[in-house]
Amino acid sequence: MEGWQRAFVLHSRPWSETSLMLDVFTEESGRVRLVAKGARSKRSTLKGALQPFTPLLLRFGGRGEVKTLRSAEAVSLALPLSGITLYSGLYINELLSRVLEYETRFSELFFDYLHCIQSLAGATGTPEPALRRFELALLGHLGYGVNFTHCAGSGEPVDGTMTYRYREEKGFIASVVIDNKTFTGRQLKALNAREFPDADTLRAAKRFTRMALKPYLGGKPLKSRELFRQFMPKRTVKTHYE
């Protein structure tokens, strides 16, 4: 793949005294691992561009699992993330690194990612709605199809006044039992619309996406959450990550 592709760096680390190993998300090739030779040298013009949240054009090639970066250009300055929006951006980057296979095309997800970080950059309040929409979009692209509009047991449309319990691989079934797997019909309608008008629907969306993403993430904790807990005020941590 030698043509130019739109891309974002998800993560980078030193590979040698002068090179970087990059985990990138591209429009056409999906997630790709690249070696950026010479990117750490003092004379390199790439070092400043190969950063998370900077829209890039990349050209790369090679036959193995690890490709070689041929050229890179920053399309614009990095999207301005700071504080809680920066940690939110690091979270979605880590999420993609954990759940996406290498070199599997996700062109629509690429634009969902772009829209998410643009929303984070422009956020004046909580970043949670943008995060929940992205998580739901990611689950959809991974093939995790869930029907939020109809009861999996009866086939009847979801009633906003009723309670439904989530069952993996089946969907939501009307239930009188209330536990961490139950959702109100109103909450399910909010999930389906990807609109979260209040704290109740946001909490429900977080609860569902945590539950649905767990099989993809396994038991290994996300480093971005740990960083968030270390460096952000406790009240903010509880509000956004608990």
Curated annotation (Swiss-Prot):
**Disulfide bond residue pairs:** none
Query: What is stated as this protein's family in its record?
Result: Belongs to the RecO family.
Family annotation (InterPro entries): ARFGAP/RecO, DNA_rep/recomb_RecO_N, NA-bd_OB-fold, RecO, RecO_C
Which organism's genome codes for this protein? Shigella flexneri serotype 5b (strain 8401)
Question: What HAMAP family does its record include?
Answer: RecO
Give a short account of what the protein does.
Involved in DNA repair and RecF pathway recombination.
The entry's cellular-component GO terms read: bacterial nucleoid
On subunit structure and binding partners, the annotation says: Monomer.
Name assigned to this protein: DNA repair protein RecO
Tell whether DNA repair is among the UniProt keywords: yes
Which GO terms of type biological process are on file? DNA recombination; double-strand break repair
Under Pfam families, the record lists:
RecO_C, RecO_N
Tell me which UniProt keywords the record has, alphabetically: DNA damage, DNA recombination, DNA repair
